[in-house]
Amino acid sequence: MDAAVIGLQWGDEGKGKIVDHLAGDFDSVVRFNGGNNAGHTVIVGERTYKLRVLPSGILREDVVSVIGNGVVLDPQGLLDEIHLLKKEGVQIHPGKLLIADNCHLVLPIHRELDVLFEQKQKLGTTKCGIGPCYQDKVARRGIRLCDLRSEEQLRKTLAGLSYYHNIVRKGAGLQEVCQEILFASLFAMRDELLCYAVPPCELQGILSGKSKLYEGAQGMLLDIDHGTYPFVTSGSSGLGQVMNGAALGCVNRVIGVMKGYVTRVGEGILPTEQDNAFGSELQKLGKEVGTVSGRIRRCGWCDLPLVRYVNAVAGVTEIVITKLDVLDSFNEIFLCCAYKGKKGKLIEICSPSKLCYSKYEAQYIVMKGWRSSTVGVTSFCDLPDGAKSFVETIEKCLDLPVTMISNGPERTQVLHR
């Protein structure tokens, strides 16, 4: 049975750990969206791996890792990541890593534009060039991995891309694109990149009959359509993107991952944000610092109306709660169960667009903290009563089963129900 792991909040929910934990039960792990702007941290024993574009399954020797066509690929960043993991003893070779050859490539000129646009618009991007790369993809002028197979095709595509970028760069006072430098840098990486490249139709054949675990980047509240627009990423993060960004067939399980609280990096609304001692304590105990950006994450209480909305649009079938242990020391824990509108009407499912343009007041369930450690507990029955009540309340409010709970940073610190 194939499964997809998606984030139910603003990213950083712990999807990488859950994918790594589950990967041993699947033949392959497939990244279907995003780029190296989204970091996944996986802890195995005493080693911490900070992955950016490689699927979290790369740490499993007998699992095939796939980068699907929905990913925008920084070629130098990918090779740097591969080289670093190889130095740490991780086995990576053609056959263990497969990349759809119609992936679009993130170039230095994309990063330069990202920095330029962020200075003006301040959307809170990671300045990795992801948005400008997606712009070129949609405008049909981007460079794809398969373009590296032909010197003639690569030069032709670079010429068209440079024509557009030079217009933008002239207006911004930047130097023109040097096509020869871009061509030389891409051509120098060609052989090392293309050894992993496979056309999508061949990927389907290679993975036919094999179980697949799809790994999402970011979270649904950063989705370009369903998130807190315009403070979102440039791609889609949900089930539809699994189909389009991997093109490998249907999914039976949609596993939604959420923290027991919420965090957000950068700009945009965070309705339950705690800009106070609670928020500072969540940030400190949860070590809430962006894997890629290094920025401190804003923290708040768990927002269930938004999660209900995400579950509805993403077709979530089960829930995973992560970082339960971060809440171990709190005397009181708050769960936002609804919003109150202007006329006092309670809203239990709320779209981000409503929150962006209307004033709603968060309504909380106040729960007594359990004040004891949940770290490494292996059975739900052995959790403190307060922790069990917290999980069961979320389960009841969302009307979906909580099938896994992460209660520590390590690979093994996940309990199943």
From Swiss-Prot:
Positions bound to substrate: T291, V292, S293, G294, R295, I296, R297
Residues holding Mg(2+): D12, G39
Cofactor(s) this protein cannot do without: Mg(2+)
GO biological process, one term: IMP metabolic process
Record note on cofactor: Binds 1 Mg(2+) ion per subunit.
Associated pathway: Purine metabolism; AMP biosynthesis via de novo pathway; AMP from IMP: step 1/2
A single cellular component GO annotation: cytoplasm
Domain of life per record: Bacteria
A GO molecular-function descriptor: adenylosuccinate synthase activity
Enzyme class: ligase
Catalytic activity: IMP + L-aspartate + GTP = N(6)-(1,2-dicarboxyethyl)-AMP + GDP + phosphate + 2 H(+)
Gene3D superfamilies, sorted: Adenylosuccinate Synthetase, subunit A, domain 1, Adenylosuccinate Synthetase, subunit A, domain 2, Adenylosuccinate Synthetase, subunit A, domain 3
Binding site for GTP: 11-17, 39-41, 297, 323-325, 406-408
Enzyme Commission number(s) from the entry: 6.3.4.4
Keywords attached to this entry: Cytoplasm, GTP-binding, Ligase, Magnesium, Metal-binding, Nucleotide-binding, Purine biosynthesis
HAMAP family: Adenylosucc_synth
Entry's family note: Belongs to the adenylosuccinate synthetase family.
Name this polypeptide is given: Adenylosuccinate synthetase
Organism field: Neorickettsia sennetsu (strain ATCC VR-367 / Miyayama)
Gene name for this UniProt entry: purA
